[in-house]
A protein has these predicted regions:
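Elongated, amphipathic alpha-helical interaction scaffolds
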Residues: 1-189
Length: 189
């Protein structure tokens, strides 16, 4: 999927993301790397999610076709106070007077709701890279360690990091070395 400008009209805002992909459930994943503090950052990621939702449903489609969106923000600045490096946000419906959480029913015969809120509403992940200060054990932690340090461990088991290491080695070669490497690969294939 594209990841740059998706401006529909001249007066429309565009939504620049670093990676936009679909998973095996046809849900949309938006990944954005943010190096510097930005005014109205939360509003911008909300706009990006709304834009992605509307881009992936046409006028003739039923609202049931609305795609689930995951917004992942990799932050290299301090967005606020908190002890964790990974935060998750999702819509919940809470009683104003009672404080109880509304349990949506989808099983009844004439239910007006076919999906649970967790299956419909966007989810937001804020990864505060600079707050990661532990030994990476899980694949996610290995990725965050790489994002913080720029180094990939030789014993990594995280999906994609081994491939990323190979790409980094390739792109760190001089143009002459890359050409020789490409010629070598062509010769043996």
């Amino acid at each position: 999927m594209g990841s740059e400008s998706n401006q529909q009209t001249i007066d429309d805002k565009f939504n620049r993301v670093d990676i936009k992909a679909r998973n095996s459930k046809d849900e949309i994943i938006i990944v954005e790397i943010q190096n510097t503090r930005e005014l109205y950052y939360l509003e911008r990621i909300l706009y990006g999610v709304a834009k992605a939702i509307t881009e992936h449903i046409s006028l003739s489609e039923c609202y049931y076709e609305v795609k689930k969106i995951y917004s992942i923000s990799i932050l290299y600045f301090d967005i606020g106070k908190g002890d964790d490096y990974l935060y998750h946000g999702q819509n919940n419906f809470t009683g104003v007077h009672t404080g109880d959480r509304l349990e949506i029913t989808t099983k009844e015969k004439d239910a007006l709701v076919r999906k649970l809120p967790a299956e419909v509403f966007p989810e937001y992940f804020l990864i505060r890279v600079n707050e990661f200060n532990k030994v990476a054990v899980t694949p996610l932690e290995e990725w965050i360690e790489y994002l913080k340090t720029g180094c990939i461990r030789h014993d990594t088991t995280a999906p994609g990091l081994g491939e990323a290491r190979k790409k980094l080695i390739y792109y760190n070669m001089s143009p002459e070395e890359r050409h020789a490497y490409d010629e070598h690969l062509s010769a043996i294939m």
